[in-house]
Amino acid sequence: MLFRSRVEKVSELLETLPYGGVEQNNFVNGMFEIRTLLAPEELLQELHRIEQMEGRERKIHWGPRTLDLDIIFYDDLIYSSEDLVIPHVDMENRYFVLKPLSELTPNFRHPITHKTVAQMLAELPVDLTEGSEA
């Protein structure tokens, strides 16, 4: 359970090939929108706690993982620290992020590029979408 937060929307699940050169089974991707009282760093700590409860061990960057919970947007906040960058780095080039996100909030504008989620998905080069879905 996510502390001091409430899930508002949940996307359909999307099975894709592993990303980042990881040798493991296909990924199952999804997105959820929450309303939270947590600050960004607190939210990240809560997400890491949930990952650990589900057996995630962070031994290798881009290594195999049982669960990977990321903050993609936090309203229209632009934020950067040693542990967290919002909006999520390179999310506009990741089909497995944009596809489920477009189900929840297609008209949300990226606070840096000012493009909507639907625009970013439509503008993805074919080579980033082909072969993504398993």
Region spans (language model):
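Short, small-residue-biased leader/transition segments that mark boundaries at the very start
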Residues: M1-L2
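Short, charge-patterned binding micro-sites
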Residues: K9-R35
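Flexible, gly/pro- and Lys/Arg-enriched active-site loops
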Residues: P18-F27, E41-A134
